[in-house]
C-alpha cells in the first residue's frame, strides 16, 4: 500500500502525457506511486504509455465518465492513504509532493491540501485555475489568492503563507482517501467543472479543513485564460447553481435566487452583443437544466451531513469589487 498515489486522469491526452509525465515520474519516488486513469481514450495514449512507461499502473475505464465519474471509479481501485489528483498538463519539480503529505500527516482535521499553481507558459505568473488557493463570494463566484476573475497576478511571494482556503483546484489537489470515500467522492452529475469545489464545501460542512501549502509549487498549462467554449460556459453555470442549492445556507440561497438571474442575464446579454450567441444560449440552458434537477438536488441537499458552519465565504460581490478596480487578492481583504 502506497502512502500517496498521484492519479492522473487522461482522455485523449497523449501530447500532454508526452510533455508533462516525465517530470511527474522523475520527481515522484519513495512512498509515492504514479497511476494513470484512462477515460476510454481513442487516441494512442495507452500505446504510448505501454511503450514508454510499462511499469506505470493504468486503470482503463469503459467510457468517458468525465472528471467526476472518472476519478470516482478509478480511486475505488487504488489503496492509498492519500490521493494526489493531478491534471495531465501539470509539470512538477523535485520535492513537490512531500510538503502536501507533511500537512496531512501533521494536521488530522485537514482533508485537502493544495499546492501553489504557477503558469507553465509564464512561470512568473500565477495560474488561473488555482493560484495560491481558492475562495468564493456569497453569490458563488470563485476567485483565488493571485487571480480575481480574469486578472491574474505575478507571483512575488505575496501569498507564500500556508493557510485555510475554501477550495483547492482539481488541477492539483492532495486529499485524504478516507474522507473522499466517506463523502461519496465527486458528484457525477456534474461531469466536469465545479465538482472539486462542491466536494470541498461538503467536506467543510462535515468539519474538515482545506489548506494551501505554497512550499509545494507546480506548473499548470491549463485553459482558464482561453476563450471559453459554450460547453464550458454551460457546465460552469449549471454546476455552480447546483452546488449552491446543495450546500449554501437558506439566506445565501435566497440572495442567489434574487441576484443571480439578473447577473447571469447581463452576462448572456454581453455574449449576444459580442456576437457569441451560443454562449448566451449556454447560460439559458444551464438555468433550464438546474430547474429540471431541482427535485434531485433537494434530495442531495438533505443527505449532506451538516455538523459545522462554513467560514471563509467572501461576504461581498467579487464582480462589483472587480468593476470598482480590485485586481489583486490583497485589495479584497
Task: Locate predicted features.
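Short aromatic/hydrophobic "clamp" motif used to bind/position activated sugar donors
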Residues: 83
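Conserved donor NDP-sugar-binding/catalytic core segment of glycosyltransferases
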Residues: 91-141
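Active-site-adjacent helix/loop segment of glycosyltransferases
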Residues: 7, 206-302, 307-317
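A conserved acidic beta->alpha catalytic loop
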Residues: 23, 38-47, 63
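Glycine-rich, basic loop-to-helix element that forms the pyrophosphate-binding segment
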Residues: 60-78, 88-90, 99
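Short beta-strand/loop segment that forms part of the nucleotide-sugar
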Residues: 31-40, 59-61
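Short, acidic, metal-binding catalytic loop of nucleotide-sugar glycosyltransferases
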Residues: 23-31
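A short, conserved alpha-helix in the catalytic core of glycosyltransferases
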Residues: 160-217
Amino acid at each position: 500500500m502506497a502512502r500517496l498515489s498521484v492519479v492522473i486522469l487522461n482522455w485523449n491526452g497523449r501530447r500532454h502525457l508526452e510533455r508533462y509525465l516525465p517530470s511527474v515520474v522523475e520527481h515522484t519516488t519513495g512512498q509515492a506511486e504514479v497511476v494513470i486513469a484512462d477515460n476510454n481514450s481513442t487516441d494512442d495514449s495507452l500505446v504510448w504509455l505501454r511503450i514508454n512507461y510499462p511499469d506505470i499502473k493504468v486503470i482503463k475505464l469503459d467510457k468517458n465518465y468525465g472528471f467526476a465519474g472518472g476519478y470516482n471509479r478509478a480511486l475505488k481501485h487504488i489503496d492509498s492513504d492519500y490521493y494526489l489528483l493531478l491534471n495531465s498538463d501539470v509539470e512538477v519539480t523535485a520535492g513537490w509532493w512531500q510538503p502536501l503529505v507533511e500537512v496531512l500527516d501533521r494536521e488530522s482535521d485537514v482533508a485537502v491540501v493544495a499546492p501553489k499553481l504557477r503558469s507553465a507558459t509564464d512561470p512568473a505568473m500565477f495560474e488561473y485555475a488555482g493560484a495560491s488557493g481558492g475562495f468564493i463570494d456569497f453569490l458563488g463566484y470563485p476567485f483565488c489568492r493571485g487571480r480575481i476573475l480574469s486578472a491574474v497576478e505575478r507571483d512575488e511571494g505575496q501569498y507564500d503563507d500556508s493557510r485555510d482556503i475554501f477550495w483547492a483546484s482539481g488541477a492539483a489537489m492532495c486529499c485524504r482517501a478516507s474522507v473522499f470515500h466517506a463523502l461519496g467522492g465527486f458528484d457525477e452529475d456534474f461531469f466536469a467543472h465545479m465538482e472539486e469545489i462542491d466536494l470541498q464545501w461538503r467536506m467543510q460542512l462535515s468539519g474538515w479543513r482545506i489548506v494551501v501549502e505554497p512550499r509545494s509549487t507546480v506548473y499548470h498549462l491549463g485553459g482558464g485564460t482561453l476563450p471559453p467554449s459554450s460547453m464550458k460556459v454551460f457546465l460552469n453555470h449549471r454546476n455552480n447553481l447546483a452546488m449552491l442549492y446543495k450546500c449554501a445556507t437558506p439566506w445565501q440561497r435566497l440572495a442567489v435566487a434574487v441576484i443571480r438571474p439578473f447577473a447571469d442575464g447581463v452576462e448572456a446579454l454581453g455574449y449576444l452583443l459580442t456576437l457569441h450567441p451560443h454562449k448566451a444560449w449556454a447560460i439559458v440552458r444551464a438555468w433550464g437544466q438546474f430547474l429540471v434537477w431541482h427535485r434531485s438536488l433537494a434530495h442531495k441537499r438533505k443527505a449532506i451531513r451538516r455538523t459545522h458552519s462554513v467560514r471563509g465565504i467572501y461576504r461581498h460581490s467579487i464582480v462589483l469589487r472587480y468593476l470598482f478596480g480590485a485586481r489583486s487578492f490583497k485589495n479584497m481583504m
